[in-house]
């Protein structure tokens, strides 16, 4: 498991190598019709799109499907509960972690990491 450093800003782009994959992540906030801020994520690996516009939720692995071209999964983790991440708490309350393929499989099966 690898923690990806995030800043408490509404929009950010970062480059990180995850399990040998050159990843470009874009985390951004959109205000939805209910007036609440919602985080979304885009991911490119080696300058090739893997997914765009994925909603960021606590505990939801990204990408949702293994055939999208990423080895392993990204997961937002709420360190204080189970709320959807908000930009103001990124890097502290909400952390983004990378799970290797074996860790992602264990996570999907509900096993402790």
Predicted regions and their residues:
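C-terminal charged interaction modules
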Residues: 86-113
């Amino acid at each position: 498991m690898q923690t990806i450093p995030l800043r408490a800003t509404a929009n950010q782009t970062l480059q990180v190598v995850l399990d040998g994959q050159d990843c470009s992540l874009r985390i951004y906030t959109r205000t939805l019709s209910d007036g609440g801020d919602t985080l979304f994520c885009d991911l490119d690996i080696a300058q090739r799109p893997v997914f765009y516009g994925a909603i960021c939720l606590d505990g939801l692995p990204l990408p949702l499907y293994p055939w999208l071209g990423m080895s392993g999964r990204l997961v937002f983790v709420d360190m204080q509960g189970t709320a959807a991440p908000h930009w103001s708490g990124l890097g502290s309350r909400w952390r983004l972690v990378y799970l290797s393929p074996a860790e992602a499989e264990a996570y999907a099966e509900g096993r402790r990491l």
